[in-house]
């Protein structure tokens, strides 16, 4: 038996397999219940007593070496398979950098989360809109400057004609108009999205940017309700110590209208170059929905009232992360975008 064991030891040391099928055949040959090693184990009971210790040690050595060799070959195959699967011959020779969320997406999601906790749902609408939903339904006069081609992008029907009633939306208020058109109060929505203006691109203006507008319509909605929402939003977005102030303003779709400032988050309201020494920074416009807007969209203004507010996401991002050039948000400069990895 010792001679047979030595023969198997030599065989096992030289085991090779070209593929997984050959490896499985070797395992069956040596380690299965009917394999060569188990046959020797069965014959062990016939070994003379004086040889049992020596033969037993050799049998254990044989079994251990067979298991180790089979395991080694299996590991080599798995490593080889993984290497082949991971190899991508089209991959660039330069390191691949993992992407992160864009700073505008980070801030947009923060805004959505705040209003979601206040019971607002998200509404969406087309970026290519008609005059009705962008201007008429929002109480813009026929001669309002926003209707002029110097301020708005109009869609060309063909080379000879420009369709005056189809535009790239200038604000997400068009989503509010569609919501009022197809829903009955109570309405409580926010409208995040991209908008377009015919502007010269500079550090403080761009031809496209992003807005979030909010609309709440129900019975007995008051300006006090609006103010409470604004204060909560400011504290959630910029910190618990943030103060707000409201200044009278004008918007075609709200009456009364106001612009909201927050205490400067850089100097704490003490005055600095960023806030031009005033201690305050403007962040959004708001007001009570004009009765004409309600009526134009099929809502009885004698029964229902509401408030609306709108802010530029770029503006909020500028204030939150102190970015002073709007163009950075659309240039895809990875050096700039990587600065926001911690916020992801």
UniProtKB/Swiss-Prot annotation:
<dbReference type="InterPro" id="IPR045864">
    <property type="entry name" value="aa-tRNA-synth_II/BPL/LPL"/>
</dbReference>
<comment type="subunit">
    <text>Tetramer of two alpha and two beta subunits.</text>
</comment>
<dbReference type="GO" id="GO:0000287">
    <property type="term" value="F:magnesium ion binding"/>
</dbReference>
<keyword id="KW-0648">Protein biosynthesis</keyword>
<keyword id="KW-0547">Nucleotide-binding</keyword>
<dbReference type="InterPro" id="IPR022911">
    <property type="entry name" value="Phe_tRNA_ligase_alpha1_bac"/>
</dbReference>
<dbReference type="GO" id="GO:0005737">
    <property type="term" value="C:cytoplasm"/>
</dbReference>
<feature type="binding site">
    <location>
        <position position="255"/>
    </location>
    <ligand>
        <name>Mg(2+)</name>
    </ligand>
</feature>
<dbReference type="GO" id="GO:0000049">
    <property type="term" value="F:tRNA binding"/>
</dbReference>
<keyword id="KW-0460">Magnesium</keyword>
<comment type="similarity">
    <text>Belongs to the class-II aminoacyl-tRNA synthetase family. Phe-tRNA synthetase alpha subunit type 1 subfamily.</text>
</comment>
<dbReference type="InterPro" id="IPR006195">
    <property type="entry name" value="aa-tRNA-synth_II"/>
</dbReference>
<dbReference type="GO" id="GO:0006432">
    <property type="term" value="P:phenylalanyl-tRNA aminoacylation"/>
</dbReference>
<keyword id="KW-0067">ATP-binding</keyword>
<protein>
    <recommendedName>
        <fullName>Phenylalanine--tRNA ligase alpha subunit</fullName>
        <ecNumber>6.1.1.20</ecNumber>
    </recommendedName>
</protein>
<keyword id="KW-0963">Cytoplasm</keyword>
<keyword id="KW-0479">Metal-binding</keyword>
<dbReference type="GO" id="GO:0005524">
    <property type="term" value="F:ATP binding"/>
</dbReference>
<dbReference type="Pfam" id="PF01409">
    <property type="entry name" value="tRNA-synt_2d"/>
</dbReference>
<keyword id="KW-0436">Ligase</keyword>
<dbReference type="InterPro" id="IPR004529">
    <property type="entry name" value="Phe-tRNA-synth_IIc_asu"/>
</dbReference>
<dbReference type="InterPro" id="IPR002319">
    <property type="entry name" value="Phenylalanyl-tRNA_Synthase"/>
</dbReference>
<dbReference type="GO" id="GO:0004826">
    <property type="term" value="F:phenylalanine-tRNA ligase activity"/>
</dbReference>
<keyword id="KW-0030">Aminoacyl-tRNA synthetase</keyword>
<dbReference type="InterPro" id="IPR004188">
    <property type="entry name" value="Phe-tRNA_ligase_II_N"/>
</dbReference>
<dbReference type="InterPro" id="IPR010978">
    <property type="entry name" value="tRNA-bd_arm"/>
</dbReference>
<dbReference type="Pfam" id="PF02912">
    <property type="entry name" value="Phe_tRNA-synt_N"/>
</dbReference>
